[in-house]
Amino acid sequence: MSKKVVVIGAGFAGLAAACCLAKAGYQVTVLEKNGVPGGRARQYSADGFVFDMGPSWYWMPDVFEQFFAHFGKKTSDYYQLQRLDPSYSIFFGEDEVMHVPANMEELFAMFERYEPGSSRNLKKFLEEAKYKYEVGMADFVNKPSHSMLEFVDLRLIKSMFRLQMFTSMSTHVRQLFNNRQLIELLEFPVLFLGATPAKTPAMYSLMNYADMALGTWYPEGGMYKIVEAMVSLARELGVDLQLNQEVKQILSANGLATKVITQDREYTADAVVGGADYHHLDQQVLTPEQ
């Protein structure tokens, strides 16, 4: 009989974990406290209008394709994408708006308008960013991170300086550009990481490659289409999704989870995966002993 796994939270992380576990042969139940799946990416409807509650941009389309390919699927099996042009607009002030073009030649021309000669530096910047993206995704992000030994690789160690691990993003950008608006354009993607450019390694200019080279996309029908796609995939794989089930407690014995308690039900488990907010699980669900 297959082992039972309970996944807490039906956001992107919880749904992705559930799909992978189900494919591996586990009997998976996902518990979601809200009445709809999606977590921070859930949807809200009122008076005939529909609102995405969380993410508004679709970057790094290759990551989504890679996820669905793991199950023999494509994103286009579930939703259609449109590349946005302009990618987005930045409002520096009431009369100061920068429309960032999707076309690379138009992007170079825009940089020239703000700072003559800067397009040459942008090409250099994006060439370096492409290398960081390819190495960063293959050798860091896509590794399971079970052990630090995964990263003890002579090739990686040699590439540390090219990845600019010891230079800040702020310093890196200012070495190539002087215009205030261009600097702010190139620095803002690292804010998605929850850090400031001054305290973020320049390796994360890989985010600029994702932005300017891979583009900003939007699923037709809204970002919630991604959630619907992942829910559909999970159900195709046999995942049991239970809504309105807020986890109150995890029971354990000999250091192993045995049962998950919600407001009105109990779920036996051989393993539990926490896909909800770490702080909430740590402070509100787990006991100090756990």
Where are these regions (language model features)?
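Flexible loop/turn segments at secondary-structure boundaries
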Residues: 37-39, 193-194, 249-251, 279-283
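Generic, well-ordered alpha-helical scaffold segments in large soluble proteins
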Residues: 15, 24, 172-176, 185-189, ...
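Conserved acidic residues
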Residues: 4, 258, 270
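Flavin (primarily FAD) binding-site architecture
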Residues: 274-290
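Helical element adjacent to the flavin cofactor pocket in flavoenzyme catalytic cores
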Residues: 206-257, 263
